[in-house]
Amino acid sequence: MVSARPAFISGGPSTGGWRPTRQAAERTGGPEHSIEEVAGRGAPGHRSAEGWLRGKTLAPQRKREAIRRMLEHTPLSERRACRLAGLSRDAFRHAPVPTPATQALSARLVELAQTHRRFGYRRLHDLLRPEFPSVNHKKIYRLYEEAELKVRKRRKAKRPVGERQKLLASSMPNDTWSMDFVFDALANARRIKCLTVVDDFTRESVDIAVDHGISGAYVVRLLDQAACFRGYPRAVRTDNGPEFTSRAFIAWTQQHGIEHILIEPGAPTQNAYIESFNGKFRDECLNEHWFTSLAQARDVIADWRRHYNQIRPHSSCGRIPPAQFAANYRTQQANNAVPFNPGLYQ
């Protein structure tokens, strides 16, 4: 006895894995038409239904777009196109309308994504939380995907991102701190990582932290310790390293109202103060010592930092040590005397 069920063929397009065969068409009394024939595969200037649906599973918005294109470029009916796309006719005809609150949230999300082009949806959610405290990360992710804001992965050489940052001279202590990382190795070839922080105005070394690994949260703790003695800066200047673009570091700058100046990738001259300091640090300290342990490296580097701040003359400070330069500035400001000459070009 011949079964009346249609034959199944594996590997078919997005139709549930089956398509009618010649025998099935003869049994049902209808003509034999495959999906390709119905969609007009052989017609010049037309794409098949498979062409509109090939690839990964589409979101509802993309499915509506695919259905519209099939209706425009193929002889498929609306019912057939919706069935191929896996979307009901009601969902195709009646797209959801976002509420005014969702529209405002989406507009703000797009604005932040355009400002911070390398931030993902979780970091953007951190920025949006103060303005939209009741919105969770799942809704942010949905709006993030709908707006096609996904950050592209860089496969090759880095390209400049963002606008060029002009390097401005600071006018007072704690106006801007510049920071960066310097790497070296112990005698056993184990790597050490040094966080260097410099006050752009006084040229003082605010801190040099030495460890095998320094994360964004570690950087925040070190800066809080330095601020206990010096106070917090108005702004910090960094590169686009993961430690300085981490959620912990961004939250720290927002908590204390600190401006975060990010330089362009591959443009170290935009962070010239810390690059100059790092050159002196490597030439006068790291290249002159062979560290056998992390403890020794910390002791030697701490001694060099004290010598740099208190004894070593600095040309940008008028040939006096940075600590003396800072003390002279505070004295002049306290006495309210003649305007202080920073001596940057003496």
Curated annotation (Swiss-Prot):
Keywords of this entry: Transposable element
Any coiled-coil regions, as ranges: none
Record has Cell division as a keyword: no
Keyword Protein transport: no
Residue segments, region Disordered: 1-50
Disulfide feature: none
Protein name: Insertion element IS476 uncharacterized 39.2 kDa protein
Organism from which the protein derives: Xanthomonas euvesicatoria
